């Protein structure tokens, strides 16, 4: 797994834990740093900050274009993967669109249900098509 792939996976862990514990993602990051004394990958921090700062808009896009799936109905891990993928796709110009989608699908293949990769690919693919109008 690439350094950015590991950073995505760690960001997913942080965001997932924060959601499950109803805690701040930054508190989760801080607690992890204190426990391990490890330096947090800068890209992990960038993802967490980006998703947290844009979560309302990201969730609105996901809710609007998920066709019959509310955020609450989605498995938690899928919801977090979609938030990361949407942030990379729409708000991180350093990541090519295709990479954002394929990395999100790869996380889903590893961490979620058999149906999740196809769902995530379809939803992020739709957002990719609509990207110019979504950011206008």
UniProtKB/Swiss-Prot annotation:
InterPro entries: NusB-like_sf (IPR035926), NusB_fam (IPR011605), NusB_RsmB_TIM44 (IPR006027). Gene3D superfamilies: NusB-like (1.10.940.10). One of its GO terms (cellular component) is cytosol. Keywords: RNA-binding, Transcription, Transcription antitermination, Transcription regulation. It holds the Pfam family NusB. GO terms for biological process: DNA-templated transcription termination; transcription antitermination. One of its GO terms (molecular function) is RNA binding. The keyword rRNA-binding does not apply. Involved in transcription antitermination. Required for transcription of ribosomal RNA (rRNA) genes. Binds specifically to the boxA antiterminator sequence of the ribosomal RNA (rrn) operons. PANTHER family: ANTITERMINATION NUSB DOMAIN-CONTAINING PROTEIN, N UTILIZATION SUBSTANCE PROTEIN B-RELATED. NCBIfam families: nusB. Belongs to the NusB family. This is Transcription antitermination protein NusB. It comes from Pseudarthrobacter chlorophenolicus (strain ATCC 700700 / DSM 12829 / CIP 107037 / JCM 12360 / KCTC 9906 / NCIMB 13794 / A6) (Arthrobacter chlorophenolicus).
